[in-house]
């Protein structure tokens, strides 16, 4: 999966001219060193490796001819040399941490079915692949689903396949991300990206709570990308999410951190890729 995503990210970046990240932020280098008892040394060290020491003592006494009958061994007759003692010693190991953490958010309420969900998920797969290439595979993912309540799910399969028949409160997904980031202090170690896919429905018509959570997110987020995939029956009307994102002025106020893309449900891959360019430009 990781190798395939990286290759797709390379193709998206090179063949489809998706932009390269010029500056990944202050958290670009997240290699650290840890010390583990992985190396062994004879004679001196921190912790005696009893099994390895016993093996070495037996080998020494076999070589000296002090074990004539291997089926009748008396440990009291062993000669023990200081060089037979095997110790584990601390070794400096390089531990790479992920540079980017991506939250994928998806409305899975009753109205999110068929082509709309497929378009959202396809775009999110491509976004993940692009980031894998940009960050040289150092990417972690978290998956959030929401209807009137938000929940985190463990993997992409659940993220893609789960659905319910409830209504929609968009703010719950953004609030959950904020709560997770603050509780786990994730902004300290990661460049954080948030991508939300929806059909534009929201019971919170003026988006007051959603806008509050987005403002709260601006403290740490590298990019928020909102994709609205409209049902064909919407026509020329604006969805609730489009209305309040545009009328609030938040897209202009935070133009370097939040982007909006709107597309119809009958999209092909080329249009999805054009949407990605808009979200990450």
Predicted segments — roles?
Residues 93-95, 133-135, 182-189, 215-217:
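Surface-exposed acidic, glycine-flexible loop patches that form ligand/cofactor-binding
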């Amino acid at each position: 999966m990781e190798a395939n995503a990286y290759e797709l990210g390379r193709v998206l970046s090179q063949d489809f001219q998706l932009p390269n990240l010029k500056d990944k932020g202050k958290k670009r280098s997240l290699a650290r060193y840890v010390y583990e008892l992985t190396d062994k040394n004879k004679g001196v060290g921190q912790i005696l490796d009893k099994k390895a020491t016993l093996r070495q003592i037996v080998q020494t006494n076999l070589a000296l001819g002090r074990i004539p009958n291997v089926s009748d061994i008396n440990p009291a007759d062993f000669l023990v040399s200081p060089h037979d003692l095997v110790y584990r010693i601390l070794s400096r190991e390089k531990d790479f941490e992920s540079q980017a953490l991506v939250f994928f958010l998806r409305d899975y309420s009753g109205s999110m079915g068929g082509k709309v969900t497929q378009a959202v998920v396809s775009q999110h797969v491509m976004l993940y692949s692009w980031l894998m290439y940009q960050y040289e595979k150092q990417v972690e993912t978290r998956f959030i689903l929401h209807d009137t309540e938000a929940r985190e799910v463990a993997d992409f399969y659940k993220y893609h396949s789960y659905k319910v028949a409830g209504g929609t409160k968009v703010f719950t997904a953004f609030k959950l991300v904020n709560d997770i980031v603050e509780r786990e202090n994730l902004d300290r170690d990661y460049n954080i990206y948030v991508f939300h896919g929806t059909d534009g429905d929201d019971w919170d018509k003026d988006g007051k709570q959603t806008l509050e959570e987005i403002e709260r997110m601006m403290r740490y987020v590298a990019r928020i990308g909102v994709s609205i995939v409209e049902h064909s029956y919407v026509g020329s009307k604006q969805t609730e999410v489009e209305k309040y994102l545009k009328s609030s002025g938040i897209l202009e106020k935070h133009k370097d951190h939040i982007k909006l893309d709107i597309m119809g449900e009958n999209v092909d891959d080329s249009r999805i890729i054009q949407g990605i360019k808009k979200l990450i430009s």
